[in-house]
Each structure stands twice: as structure tokens, then as C-alpha cells.
A protein has these predicted regions:
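Charge-biased low-complexity segments
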Residues: 1-114
Length: 114
């Protein structure tokens, strides 16, 4: 039974710290804000058993400039506590969705372990 227990990866400081990092480090070029409209960019990535972010790629795109900014931010994330399966660190898939116009909004979702 314990071999099936899975825990999600955790960003240092938790979900609120993750959202604060994204908000505080986001560059909002004026043209991106003007052209983004209402849309969300979703990036999926792997948090490795070492807590590193690898393989970030788009799942949903909104606007080229906004998409690039979300991908840049995701690639800056580091220091995760890895997911575990059966008490052992393992790779995990995570998705982050962000919109920046008309206001910042973000959500993170644990997809599963690998």
C-alpha cells in the first residue's frame, strides 16, 4: 500500500510563494498587454527527482510574446521539493497556466508522476 502513495512536488514556500514569484518576476511588455486580449498560456514541465525544472513546453498558447514570457518564468523556477512515490523521489509532471491581461492570474496543477 505504501508503495502506491504519491505526493506532489512542492515549490519552496508553497503555492502562494510560487504565484508571488511569477507575479514579481513577470515582464509585461506594453505590446504584449495591448495584444494579449483575454487568454491563458499553459506550460507543462517536469520537476525531476532532483527538484529541477526540465522539458518545459506549451500546452496552450495565447499570444507569442505572452507565451514566451510564461515559458521564461517557468524555466526560472528552481529548488522544488520533488514528488515522491512510495516514499522515494520521482519525476513529476506539472502544468502552470497564466494570464496577464487584464490582470495577472495563475494556477498550478500536479498532473502525475513518471
Amino acid at each position: 500500500r505504501a508503495a502506491r502513495v504519491v505526493t506532489a512536488p512542492k515549490y519552496p514556500g508553497g503555492t502562494n510563494a510560487l504565484y508571488a514569484f511569477l507575479r514579481e518576476n513577470m515582464c509585461k511588455p506594453q505590446i504584449a498587454i495591448e495584444t494579449a486580449g483575454y487568454g491563458t498560456t499553459t506550460v507543462q514541465f517536469i520537476v525531476t527527482r532532483n527538484g529541477e525544472v526540465v522539458g518545459a513546453d506549451y500546452k496552450r498558447r495565447c499570444n507569442e510574446r505572452v507565451d514566451k514570457e510564461v515559458l521564461r518564468l517557468v524555466n526560472m523556477l528552481s529548488g522544488w521539493t520533488p514528488a515522491t512515490k512510495g516514499g522515494k523521489p520521482c519525476d513529476a509532471v506539472v502544468q502552470i497556466s497564466m494570464s496577464i491581461f487584464p490582470s495577472f492570474n495563475a494556477s498550478a496543477q500536479f498532473v502525475g508522476v513518471r
